[in-house]
Amino acid sequence: MNPPAYTSTSGSVASTGNCAICMSAISGLGKTLPCLHDFCFVCIQTWTSTSAQCPLCRTVVSSILHNITSDANYEEYEVIFDDEGYNEDAPLQIPEEPGVNVSPQPPVHSTANSASNTALMRSHAQPRVLAPDNSSVFQPSTSSHASFSSGFAPYSQTPPVGASNLEATRVSRSAVITPTTSTGPRLHLSPSSRSVSQRLQTLFGITKLPGVPTEPPAYAQAEAHFGQANGYGQHRGALHGSYPAVLTAQDTSQIPTRLPFRATDRDVMEVLNSHVICSLCWVGWDEQLATLFPPPIVEPTKTLILNYIAIYGVEDVKLKVSLRCLLHDLTVPFVENMLFLIDRCTDPTRISMQAWTWHDTPIRLLSGPIKSPDGGSTSQDTSVSNIHRSPPGGSSTQPSSGRRPGRPKGVKRRLFVDDDTGVSTNESVFPVINAPIHHKNSKLAALPTGSTTDSNERLVVESPGASAEQPSTSGSSPSPSRRRGRKQGIARIEMLTKKVRRK
């Protein structure tokens, strides 16, 4: 089995594969111990802030290797949890290795803002031996992590850029740094007057180190050997033990039903074609979301993630920031967050109608032009928009459901003047019926004499006295015979209306 290829860029070793969390090329390599899976360091560091398990194999992650420049020069980010069953007073048990002097240090409690990130990194002068020695590979013991369990982190994480509104939700969490056993310097990060970029640079270890080796490091060989010893291969291009083979978008029918969703849209298929997905990548999505959110909002979370992907695209930086804000904050309002992002989507072509399925149930994503908060649309085509807003300073002219513009709701009262007496009388007049009247053929015989139906099924009532008369010109008063015919026609219409209403 060939190990994955690695290249050296910007002073540190980088992997040529894709990150399983953000589904994009790995930027800033971070490897999890003991399973040795590759991720973006920012992505896996954010992931481990709420869960101690590897997102691929569900192994308890003890630390993350990053800033790897050689076999003997790298930095390690420790994943520390203060969950149930974990003794905070007891130091973390790390297997003793030859040539490493253990010097325990007292715990240090943060005196800065309680919303600080308590990530703990250490630079190894004498790191762990991961190269094969006498046909054996050092495998860190997992007995020290038996008390670890996935759940919420007791400490807060520095929110990503653009997520300052989530800072208030993290104030109630306390920052505690536990002792570590290392001969290298200890680095404690706390918020201060430094800028956000400086804190991120210190937190994520973005440094330029010279002397980068050109050959793959020894831990790549250890990764291949470790995978074979545990019954599964590497993440990309191999099987994961008893799980199904590596699946691509062309073979989505073989994906188990326990997966959170299955993509069926053509655009999504093209995205998945560039990233080979194995079934183990999706194992535990339900369990992971269940540990992050209450059960009633697990399904809305999945739908919201799909909308994020539809709006921003898989390779957009905003998608990563949005997913971090969504998956690592317990009080995020899903609907408001989604509408906030949609209202600020200036490119309506990025949003297309996509169909997703979850347990064979279709989920329709957002589509069409987006209504901005001020009432204007981001696209010229507003036919698919269902948002109706009242004009400022006036009532809305949008008709209600089931009514036509200008159509009265009931019988309209019309004023007629009797030319003989000069007294105005109120007569109930039913408005002109423009819509087709659906009636049974058996009822046609019940129509009054002189009433017919035209080609559009419009009811036409002709009065006997006025049938032979020509229509009067505009401005002339109607004759008495026409007035009598009009009243008779009105009476017949009212009678038909009452019969229809009774039925």
UniProtKB/Swiss-Prot annotation:
SUPFAM superfamilies: RING/U-box (SSF57850)
Superkingdom to which the source organism belongs: Viruses
GO MF: ubiquitin protein ligase activity; zinc ion binding
Class of enzymatic activity (EC top level): transferase
Catalytic activity: S-ubiquitinyl-[E2 ubiquitin-conjugating enzyme]-L-cysteine + [acceptor protein]-L-lysine = [E2 ubiquitin-conjugating enzyme]-L-cysteine + N(6)-ubiquitinyl-[acceptor protein]-L-lysine
Ranges of Low complexity composition bias in the record: 389-403, 471-480
Enzyme Commission number, as recorded: 2.3.2.27
Annotated region described as Disordered, given as residue ranges: 175-194, 367-418, 445-503
BP term (GO), one: protein polyubiquitination
Assigned keywords, A-Z: Host-virus interaction, Metal-binding, Modulation of host ubiquitin pathway by viral E3 ligase, Modulation of host ubiquitin pathway by virus, Repressor, Transcription, Transcription regulation, Transferase, Ubl conjugation pathway, Zinc, Zinc-finger
RING-type zinc finger locations on the chain: 19-58
Compositional bias annotation for Polar residues: 375-388
PROSITE patterns: ZF_RING_1, ZF_RING_2
Organism: Cercopithecine herpesvirus 9 (strain DHV) (CeHV-9)
InterPro entries hit by this protein: Znf_C3HC4_RING-type, Znf_RING, Znf_RING/FYVE/PHD, Znf_RING_CS
Assembly behavior: Interacts with host BTRC; this interaction seems to inactivate SCF-mediated protein degradation in general.
UniProt protein name: E3 ubiquitin-protein ligase IE61
Role according to the record: RING-finger E3 ubiquitin ligase that degrades host SP100, one of the major components of ND10 nuclear bodies, thereby disrupting the organization of these bodies. Also plays a role in the inhibition of host NF-kappa-B pathway by blocking the SCF(BTRC)-mediated addition of ubiquitin chains to host IkappaBalpha/NFKBIA, thereby interfering with its degradation.
Comp. bias (Basic residues): 404-414
